[in-house]
């Protein structure tokens, strides 16, 4: 039986596939409209109120405030971002075929748009996927461990608001840097609305710059610094002066981003302040990058920090059923568990 070639080429990138199921123009436009539909402001505010009372669920917040910028980012293993995929009908016809083969995962009573959103999360490998968010439960636990009485927390790669919201609900002052101006604007709006709907005064300081750039006003102020920084080219954001793009050399990235970030964190931390980092080895274009060893080596060779401990980050959303898929398709190496390494300033 001859395998049908339905390879897709768009924006100079190609995705090899035999799958395609035609969509009418009306169906295609309806799918795009549904996937781009956001939660309402009231739904997002309800999430904010629940978060202030201890909840870790924030899907409505992400959907309302962050969806546009989130959809512009793409996994470095994939051909397109969700934003790009939605703009090209053949890509949606590929996903239309994917959702037609398993009615348990993609039930017929749900719309095509809803099922394709699920497919972005479960089976978009090499084509396009939704970028993950850092689990709020984990940052809650870290802040309650290292800042039980409050203090100043520096998040050196802001991400999708989970760490900022955790700091806000735990009564911790939040300092965040990120080069993505659209993200920073969204975080400012989240903070303002959180204060309004919860009646809470938060202490949030946001800087629209990369962590490799020194910010004098933070020097000597920080008690605890933690983030889940870019895993080299595993995720590409393409907004603002990002630390890397598809053409960035790995060793140059270590020299120009990781090393100055570590130096800056040292300057920001108070005496005996804590520096923690979530890192994991990755595979991009069949090349394995040993981020764990390389970044820990840089930290230890700096002579500025003493190793304290590690914490497990259980992230089942990155598990794809086998060691092969975990290593070669998700972009993460062998195990799905990730580690948080903790150091103390010396």
Residue ranges and their predicted role:
Residues 1-61, 66-86, 90-346:
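Class I S-adenosyl-L-methionine-dependent methyltransferase catalytic core
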